């Protein structure tokens, strides 16, 4: 439809041109490859031109050149093949339209297109100018038009246009980034001869939120896209204004530094004004940050901030500031009288939160139940006087108000008048009167109606009187007491509110009791009590002693001695003296206090009986009491954690802050009570109560069973058989982690698993039992109280039995029992006659029939049996679930012996034998008893009793009864009594004869009837038994011989070996019980033999040999152990040729038998003695004040060395037998400068001696920082130099960061307002007459808000474009940094939040944040904002990312393996482009390599030597440009490692093994000894040993062995590996190398000595030749020599032929003698003249 409209437009345009020959078409048209385009075209001609045969329309391509036909309306065949099917003429020529549609565009279609139309001969027209068509590969960037200025609320149109129009394949324009709820889009296509275009319009109503918004318009055609972005700059008033509170989440305390920051989310332009308002009143401060340096009461209120700019302003939401503090207001104000009501209000500043909780304390004691804001004291008394304060608390903390004093005025109470004489310094009497009164009372002391003293000053001013007074106190001291001073004294107290008085009868001759050494002593200490009196000592003087008012002693001694005071001696003592003339008054009481250590605490842990049971409301009680004076400090521990303590935690008046909410702690002297509400599983277990005081400690434990584990049976505890039952273990616990449940039935383990429920389906009678459950968690375990499960079922068939009871008379007992639940009702019948029933027992109490009923049992006793009692008896059982019955026939028989309780007896039982006849007992009947056929003469009654039967009384008993006057006897059948007993007195004896036969003997014996079965076990293996035949036991092993007898078992082991060792157990069992006896057999089959002795001196030869007797020698594995550590190898012996202290250990050999545990021999301790060594002398100084100096001397020596410590040649201390071995400690309290100097320590033992010394210097000078070492900027700071030893005049020299600052007599530096420049280390130097002393540096830290923020950026384009944005700031404490881009947070100092483009990597350092962003377009100039904030304030800065300049790009990368091809390209900002006549210079490590005209530097095979820093310099027509350097890393596998061995030359005790390798990247190094990993460059990869120290550095691994043990010697292999390969090397490390080194040194010494000898001989020969030469020169006429040349050798013939060299000087002689070339030259003959 749109296309038809376009054609109509073209047609209308054609009508306008009818008046002339014209062609209208655009000058240019653009298209995209693969798409299409339209050239809109209209033409016209004069109206007078006739059209006889129509109009021919023709389009040409390159009309002025090739003139190719594109379209022909009459003859399509002439169209060029290139345009066939792709060019289409739109419209009809008769309508004057000539538009051309060109499809499937190709770049070759670019060029000029011309239109020609032909009407007839002579009427033709061609458009010569034509239309230029441009076809590109990708679309051009669309054009966006927008207003120059944008502001909030404005409605604006954004037009996005493109020149591409294609009707067949639409060209799409699309807006992105807008808010669809506030915007609409519309589009418009233009297709006119004047030109073609496509426009998309975005209509938006702007909001402040659109500021910074990125809008993009994207054109898409032919599957290709191109877009353009615009960044909106919308002007608006500040938005999102809010206040950031520095104390968010915590309380603002008085004096805190509070910071309020006015934060603005968005503002354009920037905020220009800030106005702070508090409680509606404007503040003077107009900065973004409002600081309250010391928060106070007046600072509380509601704060708002108003931020404005040129557009407008906005106000933040109000923020309430509450200063967390309190003060107490007392009402009424002024004097408070008794019985008044006093109100104390706990006031807080404004904006106090509603969740505040209040507590009140009086005199630092918590007032229970007072938790409201006001405390009301009704009808106050003097007891209410005191200091009160309130405590406010919320979830963030607690704060206490200043205390206020409440004073209750009241009249004077009865005065306290006391008197005592003082006899130590003459006769002095002291009278003391004190009273409780408010206001203070006036005190008057009178005697005999006369005023002796008063607080007002009136009274008798006798020179013997001395008066002292204080508020509410008066003291009178009377010198030279006399009889007139005795009598009644009165003390009167008066005030404006009332009067009071008291009297005292004073005796001037009263005694005085003194306690020595003190009135308070420690238990066990001796105490002396002395009685002093004014009486003259006479022979008849006697002293009476009283304790707590009771007379305890009377005698002539004036002293009472308690040799060892105990707690029973504590109390109130007084004494009295008397003689024949007079009696003294009683002494004032004196209290003796005996201090004692805590006794054993009485500790109970239980549930409160009132709340015990399952469910909520339970309460656990822990109560610990102790007897201690002084009171002990108590603390309760549970699983090693302190849960309560009598000490105050936190210093508050309330209960300890460390207790959790369910726990309440009550404290009293020597008592600690803990209440646990709703105790959980974690609260159960053993608690320990510890009592401690300065005199000792004691403890007691108790177990708390909180019943946190409860077993519940549903649907009920009582169920009918066949119903389902669920057993659930309900556990009250705090943790919710995994748990394991164990189920117990009748005390035995029944089931286990993770489920807390067990189901019985269906339940049966066998399930009836007592059940319990147990939970096991990480926090602990808990066992429930057993619960009984009752199962109901109908009666089974009853069991009916008849027994002859011989208890009383001829009696039969019928017993009917049944199994049923609930219990059954039983009834017993003879025939149809009911005899007895369990429900109705109506039989006569003394009748012949007696019935007894119990649960499911009915017993009928029939006495005086007769034949009529014979017959059929049956029993019926009935309950609610059913019934059953059974019957039997009973026949009465003759006389018998009745035995009670049974003929089968256990030893010690009581037994009664009765002789019974069926007709009953007649009077006068005689009885005789027989045992084993022998009459018992001692028994003639009808009964025979044994109170406790013994084995000797067992046998066959019968009785004979004969009635009086009858000749016949009734003889009973014999009854046999058998006495049995359980096994007892079992013994197992083991004996070992280690002689030649190595015989082991085991003998087991026991007493038992019936005889016990004896079993002898070796471990769990049965080796002998009384049930086996002798032949069978003997055949089991030829070395074993077994012998058996009743209750006896004997085992002989011949040739005992290792396998026979172990624990043997003898079990003795019969029907009455069992007993065990165990014994260990030590066959002594394995032991360690030490030669020459187990105690040797260091350096001796020691041999340890194992001896073993075994039958499986080939199957055994032998091991050696040293201090429980297994040694490598399985040698028969260990040879220590040169034993060292490291060999001192416990040795034992072990044998491992297949299938059995390891067996070890008895350990043998090898003790190595050595002389003192490693002598160390150290000192420690107290860190603060220098009050204590400790000098410590330690040594390594065996036997322990005698240590002596001396100072300046003077012996100070020496070790004794009671000292810690090899340690001597000297403590110097309050050290003085004279204590400084050289200290020497000497260690002596029988094997040697060692000495060392130490210079002691005292650090008495210190720097103190007040108020703290860390203060905010602007706060006052004082730096003080403290030197206790300073003596005036003193000079103080100050240094700041090691630089001189000032000097003078002032010991302090004061900074009224600290700045950053004041931060640093301060040191002071003190100079006085004693010398110069200097302190250690003390660091001062200054806190300040962020400032000097810098945002910088650069490009890192080594492989792909990467932008680096870096933000730095100056801040203390370090700032929290946020980096954002166009309003979106990219990264913070906590990590990456989100990136607008690419993937980012964040690097964080102190006050520095760096963001690396990949794939950022180099034209990106968007703004980055960095916000820095700490607790003191914030600052922000912004910057733009500058376009990228010349840079180096590496392909395939900058980290390449060795041998790889590599290209380094010098990229220009505009890309490869046209480089013209540019040249490129390349540099490596700053040195120029070469210059080329191409921007690429090629490496065919890169080598490791070519690694380094590269950069390029481009010489362009516009000038030179240099890139940033890039680092090229060449990667290669490790080379063969280099291993170096160092061994201590003196003895090989210490050694170093060093392994190094060359590789890139760094290699991972490992060091192996055989298969054992010794060291690795990876941390904690190898197990650390105490004597091995491993240090790793890049491509290096070093092992230091302080003690080179035999197990550490051998072939070491060093392996190096990285991602490209690995390599290894091996070397020997041990004393063998040291031995070879010694041999090599000896060889060198020998060769050197030999060479020296040869040189000496050669020198002597040269000297001898020289002397001979000179001698010949002196003998003129005998020899003459003519020199031919310098290089010739002269040969002389004499009687003795000699070869000598003659030259100008002696040097030529040496050359001839030592240079072999001279010996090889051709000699020439010369003439000699004699």
Swiss-Prot record:
Protein's membrane topology: Single-pass membrane protein
Single GO term (MF): virus receptor activity
Effect of residue 116 to E: Loss of sialic acid binding. Inhibits PRRSV virus attachment and internalization to alveolar macrophages
InterPro entries linked: CD80_C2-set (IPR013162), Ig-like_dom (IPR007110), Ig-like_dom_sf (IPR036179), Ig-like_fold (IPR013783), Ig_I-set (IPR013098), Ig_sub (IPR003599), Ig_sub2 (IPR003598), Ig_V-set (IPR013106)
SUPFAM superfamilies, sorted: Immunoglobulin
Compartment list: Cell membrane
Domain spans labelled Ig-like C2-type: 139-227, 238-316, 317-405, 415-505, 511-593, 601-705, 708-790, 798-893, 897-976, 983-1082, 1083-1165, 1172-1257, 1259-1335, 1346-1442, 1443-1529, 1537-1630
Extracellular side: 20-1642
Start and end residues of each stretch annotated as Necessary for PRRSV virus attachment to alveolar macrophage: 19-150
Domain Ig-like V-type: 23-135
PANTHER family: SIALOADHESIN
Protein's job: Macrophage-restricted adhesion molecule that mediates sialic-acid dependent binding to lymphocytes, including granulocytes, monocytes, natural killer cells, B-cells and CD8 T-cells. Plays a crucial role in limiting bacterial dissemination by engaging sialylated bacteria to promote effective phagocytosis and antigen presentation for the adaptive immune response. Mediates the uptake of various enveloped viruses via sialic acid recognition and subsequently induces the formation of intracellular compartments filled with virions (VCCs). (Microbial infection) Facilitates porcine reproductive and respiratory syndrome virus (PRRSV) infection via inhibition of type I IFN transcription.
Comment text on domains: The sialic acid-binding domain is essential for efficient PRRSV virus attachment and internalization to alveolar macrophages.
This protein's name: Sialoadhesin
């Amino acid at each position: 439809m749109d296309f038809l409209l376009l054609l109509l437009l073209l047609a209308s345009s054609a009508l306008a041109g009818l008046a002339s020959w014209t062609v209208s078409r655009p000058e240019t048209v653009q298209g995209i490859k693969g798409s299409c385009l339209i050239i809109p075209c209209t033409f016209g001609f004069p109206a007078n031109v006739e059209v006889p045969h129509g109009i021919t329309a023709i389009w040409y391509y390159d009309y002025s050149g090739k003139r190719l036909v594109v379209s022909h309306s009459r003859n399509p065949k002439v169209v060029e093949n290139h345009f066939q099917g792709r060019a289409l003429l739109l419209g009809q020529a008769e309508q004057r339209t000539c538009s051309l549609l060109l499809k499937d565009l190709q770049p070759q279609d670019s060029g000029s297109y011309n239109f020609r139309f032909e009407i007839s001969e002579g009427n033709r027209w061609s458009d010569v100018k034509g239309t230029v068509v441009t076809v590109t590969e990708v679309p051009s960037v669309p054009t966006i038009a927008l207003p120059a200025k944008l502001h909030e609320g404005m409605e604006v149109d954004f037009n996005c246009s493109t020149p591409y129009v294609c009707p067949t394949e639409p060209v799409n324009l699309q807006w992105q980034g807008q808010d669809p709820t506030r915007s609409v889009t519309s589009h418009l296509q233009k297709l006119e001869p004047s030109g073609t275009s496509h426009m998309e319009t975005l209509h938006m109503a702007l909001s402040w939120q659109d500021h910074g918004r990125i809008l993009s318009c994207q054109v898409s055609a032919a599957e290709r896209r191109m877009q353009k972005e615009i960044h909106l700059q919308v002007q608006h008033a500040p938005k999102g204004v809010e206040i950031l509170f520095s104390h968010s989440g915590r309380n603002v305390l008085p004096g805190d530094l509070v910071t309020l920051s006015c934060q603005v989310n968005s503002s354009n332009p920037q905020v220009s004004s800030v106005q702070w308002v508090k409680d509606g009143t404007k503040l003077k401060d107009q900065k973004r940050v409002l600081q309250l340096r010391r928060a106070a009461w007046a600072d509380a209120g509601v704060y708002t901030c108003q931020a404005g700019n040129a557009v407008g302003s906005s106000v933040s939401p109000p923020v309430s500031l509450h200063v967390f503090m309190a003060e107490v207001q007392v009402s009424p104000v002024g004097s408070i009288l008794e019985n008044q009501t006093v109100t104390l209000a706990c006031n807080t500043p404004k904006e106090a939160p509603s969740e505040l909780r209040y507590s009140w304390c009086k005199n630092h004691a918590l007032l229970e139940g007072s938790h409201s804001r006001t405390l009301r004291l009704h009808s106050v008394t003097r007891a209410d006087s005191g200091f009160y304060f309130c405590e406010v608390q919320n979830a963030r903390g607690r704060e206490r108000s200043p205390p206020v004093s409440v004073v209750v005025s009241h009249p004077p109470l009865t005065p306290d008048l006391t008197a005592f004489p003082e006899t130590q310094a003459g006769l002095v009497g002291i009278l003391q009167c004190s009273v409780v009164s408010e206001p203070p009372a006036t005190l008057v002391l009178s005697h005999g109606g006369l005023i002796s003293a008063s607080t007002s000053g009136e009274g008798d001013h006798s020179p013997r009187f001395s008066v002292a007074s204080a508020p509410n106190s008066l003291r009178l001291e009377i010198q030279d007491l006399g009889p007139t001073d005795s009598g009644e004294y009165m003390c009167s107290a008066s005030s404006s509110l009332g009067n009071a008085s008291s009297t005292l009868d004073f005796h001037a001759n009263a005694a005085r009791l003194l306690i020595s050494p003190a009135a308070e002593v420690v238990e066990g200490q001796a105490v002396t009590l002395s009685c002093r009196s004014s009486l003259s000592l006479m022979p008849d003087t006697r002293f009476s002693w009283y304790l707590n008012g009771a007379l305890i002693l009377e005698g002539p001694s004036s002293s009472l001695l308690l040799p060892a005071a105990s707690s029973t001696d504590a109390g109130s003592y007084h004494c009295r003296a008397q003689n024949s003339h007079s009696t003294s008054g009683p002494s004032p009481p004196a209290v003796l206090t005996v201090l004692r250590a805590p006794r054993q605490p009485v500790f109970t842990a239980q549930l409160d009986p009132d709340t015990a049971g399952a469910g909520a409301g339970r309460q656990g009680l822990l109560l610990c009491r102790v007897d201690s004076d002084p009171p002990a400090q108590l603390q309760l521990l549970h699983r090693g954690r302190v849960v309560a303590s009598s000490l105050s935690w936190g210093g508050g008046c309330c209960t300890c802050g460390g207790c959790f909410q369910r726990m309440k702690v009550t404290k009293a002297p020597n008592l600690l009570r803990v209440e646990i509400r709703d105790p959980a599983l974690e609260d159960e277990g053993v608690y320990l109560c510890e009592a401690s005081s300065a005199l000792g400690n004691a403890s007691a434990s108790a177990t708390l069973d909180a019943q946190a584990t409860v077993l519940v049976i549903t649907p009920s505890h009582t169920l009918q058989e066949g119903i389902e039952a669920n057993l659930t273990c309900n556990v009250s616990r705090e943790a919710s982690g995994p748990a394991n449940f164990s189920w117990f039935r009748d005390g035995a383990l029944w089931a286990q698993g993770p489920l807390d429920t067990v189901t019985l389906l269906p339940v049966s009678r066998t399930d009836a039992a007592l059940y319990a459950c147990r939970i096991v968690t990480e926090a602990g375990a808990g066992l429930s109280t057993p619960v009984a499960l009752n199962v109901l079922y109908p009666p089974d068939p009853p069991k009916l039995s008849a027994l002859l009871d011989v208890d009383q008379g001829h009696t039969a007992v019928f017993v009917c029992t049944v199994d049923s639940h609930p219990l059954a009702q039983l009834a017993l019948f003879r025939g149809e006659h009911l005899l007895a029933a369990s429900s109705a027992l109506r039989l006569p109490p003394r009748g012949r029939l007696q019935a007894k009923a119990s649960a499911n049992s009915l017993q009928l006793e029939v006495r005086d049996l007769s034949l009529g009692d014979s017959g059929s008896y049956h029993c019926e059982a009935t309950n609610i679930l059913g019934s059953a019955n059974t019957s039997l026939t009973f026949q009465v028989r003759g006389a018998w012996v009745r035995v009670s309780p049974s003929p089968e007896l256990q030893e010690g039982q009581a037994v009664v034998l009765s002789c019974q006849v069926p007709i009953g007992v007649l009077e006068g009947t005689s009885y005789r008893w027989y045992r084993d056929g022998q009459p018992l003469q001692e028994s003639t009654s009808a009964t025979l009793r044994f109170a406790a039967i013994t084995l000797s009384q067992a046998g066959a008993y019968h009785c004979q009864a004969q009635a009086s006057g009858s000749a016949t006897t009734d003889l009973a059948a014999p009854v046999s009594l058998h006495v049995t007993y359980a096994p007892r007195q079992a013994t197992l004896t083991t004996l070992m004869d280690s002689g030649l036969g190595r015989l082991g003997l085991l003998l087991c014996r026991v007493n038992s009837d019936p005889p016990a079965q004896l079993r002898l076990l070796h471990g769990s293996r049965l080796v002998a038994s009384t049930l086996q035949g002798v032949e069978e036991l003997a055949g089991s092993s030829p070395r074993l011989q077994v012998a058996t007898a009743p209750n006896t078992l004997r085992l002989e082991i011949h040739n005992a070996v290792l396998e026979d060792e172990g624990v043997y157990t003898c079990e003795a069992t019969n029907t009455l019980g069992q007993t065990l006896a165990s014994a260990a057999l030590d066959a002594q089959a394995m032991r360690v033999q030490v030669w020459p002795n187990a105690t040797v001196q260091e350096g001796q030869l020691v041999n340890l040999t194992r001896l073993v007797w075994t039958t499986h020698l080939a199957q055994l594995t032998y091991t050696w152990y040293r201090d429980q550590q297994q040694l490598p190898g399985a040698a028969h012996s260990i040879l220590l040729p040169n034993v060292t202290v490291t060999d001192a250990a416990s040795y034992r050999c072990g044998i491992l038998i297949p299938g059995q545990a390891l067996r070890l021999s008895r350990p043998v301790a090898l003790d190595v003695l050595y002389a003192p060594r490693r002598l160390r002398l150290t000192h420690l100084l107290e860190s603060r004040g220098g009050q204590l100096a400790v000098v410590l001397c330690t040594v390594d020596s065996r036997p322990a060395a005698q240590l002596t410590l001396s100072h300046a040649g003077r012996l100070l201390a020496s070790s004794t037998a009671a000292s810690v071995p090899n340690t001597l400690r000297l403590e110097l309290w309050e050290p003085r400068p004279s204590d400084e100097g050289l200290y020497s320590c000497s260690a002596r033992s029988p094997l040697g001696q060692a000495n060392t010394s130490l210079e002691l210097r005292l650090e008495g000078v210190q720097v103190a920082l007040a108020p703290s070492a860390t203060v905010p900027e602007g706060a006052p700071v004082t730096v003080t130099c403290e030197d206790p030893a300073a003596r005036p005049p003193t000079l103080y020299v100050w240094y700041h960061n090691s630089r001189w600052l000032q000097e003078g007599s002032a010991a302090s530096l004061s900074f009224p307002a600290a700045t950053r420049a004041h931060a640093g280390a301060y040191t002071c130097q003190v100079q006085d007459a004693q010398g110069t002393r200097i302190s250690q540096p003390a660091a001062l830290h200054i806190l300040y808000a962020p400032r000097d923020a810098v945002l910088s950026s650069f490009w890192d384009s080594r492989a792909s474009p990467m932008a680096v944005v870096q933000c730095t700031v100056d801040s203390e404490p370090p700032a929290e940094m946020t980096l954002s881009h166009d309003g979106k947070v990219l990264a913070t100092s906590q990590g990456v939040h989100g990136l607008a483009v690419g993937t980012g990597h964040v690097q964080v350092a102190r006050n520095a944040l760096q963001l690396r962003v990949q794939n950022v377009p180099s034209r990106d100039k968007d703004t980055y904002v960095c916000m820095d904030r700490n607790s003191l304030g914030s600052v922000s800065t912004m910057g733009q990312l500058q376009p990228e300049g010349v840079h180096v790009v590496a392909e395939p990368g900058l980290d390449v393996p060795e041998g790889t091809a590599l290209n380094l390209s010098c990229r220009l900002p505009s890309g490869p482009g046209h480089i013209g006549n540019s040249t490129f210079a390349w540099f490596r490590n700053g040195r120029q390599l070469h210059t080329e005209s191409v921007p690429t530097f090629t490496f065919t095979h890169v080598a490791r030597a070519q690694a380094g820093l590269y950069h390029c310099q481009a010489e362009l027509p516009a000038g030179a440009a240099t890139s940033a350097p890039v680092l090229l890393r060449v990667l290669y596998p490790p080379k063969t490692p280099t291993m170096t061995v160092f061994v201590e030359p003196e003895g090989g005790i210490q050694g170093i093994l060093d392994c190094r390798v060359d590789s890139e990247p760094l290699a991972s190094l490992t060091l192996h000894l055989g298969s054992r990993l010794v060291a690795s460059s990876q941390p904690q990869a190898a197990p650390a040993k105490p004597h091995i120290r491993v240090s790793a550095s890049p491509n290096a691994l070093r092992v230091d062995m302080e003690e080179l043990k035999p197990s550490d010697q051998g072939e070491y292999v060093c392996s190096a590996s990285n991602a490209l390969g690995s390599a290894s090397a091996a070397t020997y490390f041990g004393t063998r190398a040291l031995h070879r080194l010694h041999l090599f040194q000896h060889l060198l010494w020998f060769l050197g000595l030999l060479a020296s000898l040869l040189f000496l001989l050669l020198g002597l020969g040269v000297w001898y030749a020289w002397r001979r030469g000179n001698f010949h020169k002196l003998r003129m006429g005998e020899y003459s020599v003519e020199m031919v040349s310098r290089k010739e050798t002269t040969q002389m013939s004499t009687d003795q032929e000699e070869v000598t060299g003659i030259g100008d000087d002696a040097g030529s002689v040496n050359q001839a003698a030592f240079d072999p070339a001279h010996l090889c030259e051709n000699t020439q003959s010369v003439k000699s003249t004699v």
